[in-house]
């Protein structure tokens, strides 16, 4: 049954251990889980979320376990013994984070869960990892620079893509051509870094008056903490039948309809552009508290350097005259976005399989090294 604490098979030592903080990361782990099961590879899966859909998977190859929440769960995860631990969790082992680097895990490997380099990771987030399964080769310079600055040994870095995009690409329905009128999807971040707060909502009114089919998809957190602002926007736009609000958990329906997206620094920009080969208008805003992030040492954020390849990059002032910006963005050729995706994201559509292959190959390499060491000891 869903969320049931199933009896754990008492494995003294696990070869492969997947550690998840919860259901938000299910689509990141699912393609890897599927690949292990297809290959007949046994593994363990631990999660801090009793509602994690992975707990409902019934397969003798998968030893899954709910380990609780909070600091106690992090301690349980850190106490496991494994050859390889696959985790999306940054900050493991950093001062102040509740999970120390697991001492009895030989290879701690990070799976990425968004398109971007490490500039907007908190400082030291990946310092205690042994391997980074990168989205693409573009991540390598920033990882190596941080290692060099801190005198860290070089991690194994291999470009294996983004598994959750496997899952989304399988569901994506790309439409041919452009709708009439064009569909504009507005997907802001929440809080003071979002385009609605920085630019105000009047640009939505301008889009509605211009006759575009406008979809506003608030961030899920906005639905919890910014209800007053959203109520004001509802009231402002209630007389425009060409404006709709999308509060569904799954963004697929809105994304598949849209011809262009307006956003800020949200990673959803890359998901939309790469999945649907449609342009994005990015609001260029400075990073708040950059000293907390790796950008303080790197000096540059990869996502900022490439945002123009998704479409248009604009200032808050440009939102006062948003219609010409939309018209320019709509001229961005799909072929250019597809080419950018191909050069940025490795193993498109088969990342889960690639990560499973890397894991199996790494175990084989570890076994060979152990055998060689044992043979060398025996001949002494």
Locations of the language-model features?
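C-terminal amphipathic helix plus adjacent low-complexity
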Residues: 2, 308, 314-380
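Nucleotide-activated donor-dependent transferases that construct or modify glycoconjugates
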Residues: 2-23, 186
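Active-site and donor-binding regions of nucleotide-sugar-utilizing enzymes
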Residues: 14-169
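Conserved catalytic-core segment of nucleotide-activated headgroup transferases in glycan assembly
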Residues: 25-41, 163-234, 316-319, 330, ...
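Short acidic-hydrophobic, aromatic-tinged amphipathic segments that line or gate anion-handling sites
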Residues: 64-73, 244-247, 309-319
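Donor nucleotide-activated moiety binding/catalytic core segment of transferases
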Residues: 69-77, 228-270, 275
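Redox-cofactor binding/interface segments in oxidoreductases and associated redox assembly factors
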Residues: 86-87, 110, 134, 186, ...
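Catalytic binding pocket for nucleotide-activated donors in carbohydrate/polymer assembly enzymes
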Residues: 154, 267-343
